[in-house]
Amino acid sequence: VLAISIVATGMIALRQSALPLDLVRGGLSRPAVSEAGSGALIALQLALLVVLQWPVGNWVAKRSLRFGLGTGLVGFVIGCLLLASSAFWSGGMVLISLAMVPLAFGEAAFLPSAAEAMVEETPLKHRGLSMALFSQCFAISATGAPLLAGTLLDQQGHGVQLWLLMAVICLAVMPLLKTVRPRYTAGLQATPLENDEDVPSPRIASLR
């Protein structure tokens, strides 16, 4: 789950860092976009995320964790392919605008599913550590993904290779979804946890 989370949070980081730079530079046939136009597109993707977060999150919550994580990755793949394709068309802004929908949908489906998977996949005594590691995925992605994106954009002059690479990476981590085994049944019944009476308190143990 951590590996999948790093890829997904990397995609989120690239939407906020590499995408505006790609828009300003332009593509192979797509003209460059002004800073105002780039800002408007970023505002559009944030607005879409706000609108989709609750209904999509509620929808995937009624299904398995694999479904939620897989839906998020599929949304990222479709969005990346649309972003890469936009560079070959003079009216590529249409494809970029369309790409905002699956990207926002994927983020809305992935984030709650990933957080839930981190909790359910981890033994009770290690859940605090797992959530700390999950939060570090954002830090790792925010540091590494923009650095890789900047290097590719400087070398290529456009974002085709970057977005195709991200689509391939998202597809490559999908087999890891088979390892996700939630601790909750389909009937939302939790696996019984340890009773407090079964775990001796240090104070009680000392009295004994």
Where are these regions (language model features)?
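Multi-pass alpha-helical transporter architecture, strongest
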Residues: A115, L165-D198, A205-L207
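A membrane-interface helix-boundary motif in multi-pass transporters
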Residues: T151-C170
